């Protein structure tokens, strides 16, 4: 296949085939054909292989069998223009399936979510960061009242939810349907308790930083819902690559991973895509040069909303302070969140845990 081409660079070509894109799965009853099709597009392939995205204004549409009744429908688009917009020798067409649905008049929360008490911890790593929490719809049931027909329970995947400030107190979450109908639910947010923890073993990886990737690990440490574990350790690195430093693993007791995150603003796993990685390392070479012997204070919070936060404050060997956070790692089962560390041509020495006063961002002076 040839890449999508600039029409200015090619001779005129006849259309050969096309595919409709951006077709919504559902359209409210009463929507006009013009309004429905105004945002549709088609990906058109021409005789010599050129590919062009064509706007709705260059297409003609019909809906089969109609737009007036509820049910499954097909939108059929036709194109009568060449690549350069002249009348084509033949007309081509494409179709796509969608459904006309009775419009939602209002929504009501008919079953409360399972978890409405969330927790946060704002360390110094989040100075200047607008920290928010995700709403957890687990267990919630939202019922829609339609303009016509019977009431029905909506899938939570068809709803959107407002973010929640990571500040103590009661907060209102707005639940919104695709057609703009809203309802609200209240959640309570509290600052997490912090517990200093020392993993076993306290010395992880060979002292000469020769330990290979994914060969040595600390024990799994289970973080109860609503708690934050604090780890203090010295990080040693071979200095070969940015990723040859500490690595944090969030996983279930059976070792199924939620996410794996590194010291250099990078990670992966089912829960990683939803998170916000925030690193202040700046120039990588300068940062890496300070990591062999860097002091790390790292926090992991079980937010009890299906997410976890990781925050690290790193004091380099030159005295510079950088931070690394991963906020909102999701797919977390709050009753089965475990943290472990591993190394990759690196070595970690953990400090013994001791009771100490913990300063959150809000309490720093």
Predicted regions and their residues:
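Short, aromatic/His-centered strand-loop micro-motif at the edge of beta-sheets
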Residues: 273-297
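Serine/threonine-rich, repeat-prone extracellular segments and beta-strand-based repeat modules
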Residues: 25-27, 50-85, 89-92, 149-187
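Short tryptophan-centered beta-strand motifs in secreted/extracellular beta-sheet-rich domains
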Residues: 293-302, 310-312
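Solvent-exposed, low-complexity, repeat-rich "mucin-like" stalks and linkers
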Residues: 14-50, 105-150
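Secretory/extracellular carbohydrate-interaction modules
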Residues: 203-273
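Short, solvent-exposed beta-strand-to-loop segments that form ligand-recognition rims
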Residues: 315-338
């Amino acid at each position: 296949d040839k890449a999508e081409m600039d029409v200015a660079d090619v001779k005129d070509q006849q259309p050969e085939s096309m595919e409709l894109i951006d077709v919504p799965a559902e359209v409210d009853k009463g929507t006009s054909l013009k309004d429905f099709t105004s945002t549709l597009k088609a990906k058109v392939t021409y005789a010599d292989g050129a590919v062009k995205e064509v706007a709705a204004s260059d297409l003609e549409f019909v809906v089969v069998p109609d737009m007036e009744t509820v049910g499954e429908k097909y939108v059929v688009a036709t194109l009568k223009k060449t690549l350069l917009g002249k009348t084509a020798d033949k007309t081509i067409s494409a179709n796509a399936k969608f459904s006309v649905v009775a419009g939602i008049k209002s929504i009501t929360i008919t079953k409360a979510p399972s978890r409405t008490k969330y927790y946060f911890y704002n360390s110094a790593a989040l100075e200047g960061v607008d920290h928010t929490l995700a709403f957890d719809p687990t267990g919630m049931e939202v019922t829609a009242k339609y303009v016509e027909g019977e009431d029905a329970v909506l899938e939570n995947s068809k709803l959107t939810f407002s973010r929640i400030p990571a500040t103590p107190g009661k907060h209102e979450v707005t639940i919104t349907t695709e057609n703009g109908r809203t309802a609200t639910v209240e959640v309570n947010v509290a600052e997490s308790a912090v517990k200093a923890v020392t993993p076993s073993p306290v010395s992880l990886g060979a002292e000469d930083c020769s330990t290979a990737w994914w060969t040595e690990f600390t024990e799994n440490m289970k973080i109860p819902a609503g708690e934050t574990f604090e780890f203090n350790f010295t990080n040693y690195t071979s200095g070969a690559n940015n990723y040859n430093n500490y690595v944090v693993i969030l996983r279930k007791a059976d070792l199924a991973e939620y996410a794996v995150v590194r010291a250099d603003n990078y990670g992966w796993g089912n829960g990683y895509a939803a998170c916000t990685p925030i690193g202040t390392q700046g120039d990588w070479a300068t940062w890496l040069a300070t990591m062999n012997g860097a002091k790390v204070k790292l926090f992991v919070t079980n937010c009890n909303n299906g997410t976890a936060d990781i925050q690290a404050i790193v004091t380099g060997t030159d005295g510079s302070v950088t931070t690394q956070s991963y906020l909102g790692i999701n797919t977390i089962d709050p009753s089965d969140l475990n943290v472990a560390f591993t190394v990759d041509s690196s070595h970690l020495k953990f400090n013994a845990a001791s009771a100490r006063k913990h300063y959150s961002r809000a309490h720093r002076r």
